[in-house]
Amino acid sequence: MPSVEESQTNVDSSDAEAGKTARSRWLSGQTLEAIALPLAWVAVIIIFGLLRPETFLSSANLSSILASQAILVVVALGLIIPLTAGDYDLSIASVVLLSASLVAILNATLGWPIWLAILVAFAGGLIVGLINGALVILIGIDSLIVTLGMGTFVTGFVQFIGGSDTISGISDSLVNAVIVWRFLGIPLSFYYAMVVAVLAWYVFTYTPVGRRLLVVGRGREVARLSGIRVGAVRWGSLVAASLLAAFAGVLYAGTSGAASPTSGLELLLPAFAAAFLGATAINPGRFNAWGTVVAVYFLVTGITGLQLLGAQSYVQNLFYGAALIFAVTLSQFVRKRRAGGSA
């Protein structure tokens, strides 16, 4: 008959094995969640490639998909910065409009050097971000209300200074640097977006700023008690989002060679859809750079494939709207599951 000590040892060993099995299953579930969206993207490419091999898999179409969404990638990456800190920025698409319009007005209409027009465009984004932060942090207004109002104001301001006509004739130097010049057959705009993605990934993963954003987003009071300057972090996140939106506006102007009174406004819903869908991939439960990039291209791949199959243009709104609802729901589920698994 085994002794009491031997029996206790066997029990402890069984408990340890059970714990390892549970952790292994949880980690396997986490891995599956992390790669589910990339796998779905690959599956969508294969399906549409089989259905429309002559058009969908053409180098021209693939290059178009990668380059045309560079602006959305930059906007969505900007959006996840305040989202990580627990704030919304509904003015981000309007800042794209402001930036593109300033480049067009100053360069094409007034004849300013393109570099100076771009500098003013970034200054415009900086000012919007600073005002957003001041209203949210210093006065205490909810970021949703502030940025909704700011976005509406900026849109009206652009229509006031630029009129209702499309402004064309932007310098060829910008157009060449964004959409004409290519590397490996893909316009440079795609690579600019990937540089932003790498920088965002590095900041979120390896810097104190990224860790502070995450802590503030998880609990502002806990962050404050930990010595983090919560107001500065939130303010900085709104400024960073506006600066990236300004960069996206410059890319928008370079891509089209013009700016209209609505340039970039259509990016708001897709950016939110990509941000929340991306929070379910790569690093599930967190807004993250590569998940956002994959989400952008997953969504546009689906839309492009459906349109090549004959779907009408309204499928884009249906797709993005449904994706946003699904992504937010799934993101909440993943966060709750991670919280339960970590407990």
Predicted regions and their residues:
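Short loop segments and helix-boundary regions at transmembrane helix junctions
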Residues: 26-29, 83-88, 109, 126-168, ...
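Single transmembrane alpha-helix segments in multi-pass membrane proteins
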Residues: 45-110, 134-141, 275-289, 322
